[in-house]
Amino acid sequence: MRSRSFLVLVAVFLICETLVAQRLDRIRGPKGQGQDPVEGQDQDEGPGPVKVEILDIGQDPVKGQDPVKGQDPVKGQDPVKGQDLVKSQDPVKAELPDIGQDVVKGHEPVEGQDPVNAQLPDKVQDPVKAQPAVPGRFLLSKRGHCPRILFRCPLSNPSNKCWRDYDCPGVKKCCEGFCGKDCLYPK
């Protein structure tokens, strides 16, 4: 890449970064609490600061509507159907079974065995390492040597038809050909 095009990319990046920073400053409002802007500084005429409300847990916001004091967001509907939550009870923990209770009905845990570790096999095997290696196949080199190629194709990245000698049928070897690696008869 030329240095001129690199400088253009850097300049575009810096311009985009300053535009994003200006946009964030408009959204956030002035920095500090109650400070007046510095004299001589232009005020951005854009949307004012975004109003963010922190909701209590269990309160569902409805888009475009503010909750009315004294009313539930949905009339006549409890937050959890058929259950009244106790004030000290967490709704997530309320669904978990007791410590002594078995999660799977009809099955009792085996004594002295962790239920999570009981599901794992004794020896975890890698499927690639479990397969026996083919003896001598990857190191196999066919007899002879590759012929000399006088001309090369003008492509900068030619396609290869083979990678190693065993990719080629019969007595052919994988050699550098006219345009990339190809299966050729050896000398």
Swiss-Prot record:
One GO CC annotation: extracellular space
PROSITE patterns: SVP_I, WAP
Tissue expression per record: Small intestine > large intestine. The plasma contains the pro-SPAI form circulating.
Biological processes, Gene Ontology terms: antibacterial humoral response; copulation; innate immune response
Keywords from the UniProt entry: Disulfide bond, Pyrrolidone carboxylic acid, Repeat, Signal
Domain of life: Eukaryota
SUPFAM superfamilies per the UniProt record, alphabetical: Elafin-like (SSF57256)
Pfam families in alphabetical order: Cementoin, WAP
Repeat listed as a keyword: yes
Region (Disordered): 28-98
Residue stretches of each SVP-1 clotting repeat: 64-85
Signal peptide stretch: 1-21
UniProt PTM comment: The short form (AA 127-187) may be an artifact due to the strongly acidic conditions of the duodenum. The pro-SPAI form may be the native form.
Disulfide bonds: 146-175, 153-179, 162-174, 168-183
InterPro entries xrefs: Elafin-like_sf (IPR036645), SVP_I (IPR002098), Trappin_transglut-bd_rpt (IPR019541), WAP_dom (IPR008197)
Pyrrolidone carboxylic acid: modified positions: 22
Region ranges (14 X 6 AA approximate tandem repeats): 34-129
Residues cleaved off as propeptide: 22-126
Sequence ranges of the Sequence repeats: 34-39, 40-45, 46-51, 58-63, 64-69, 70-75, 76-81, 82-87, 88-93, 100-105, 106-111, 112-117, 118-123, 124-129
Entry remark concerning the domains of this protein: The repetitive domain of pro-SPAI serves as a substrate for transglutaminase.
The protein's name in its UniProt record: Sodium/potassium ATPase inhibitor SPAI-2
Species assigned in the record: Sus scrofa (Pig)
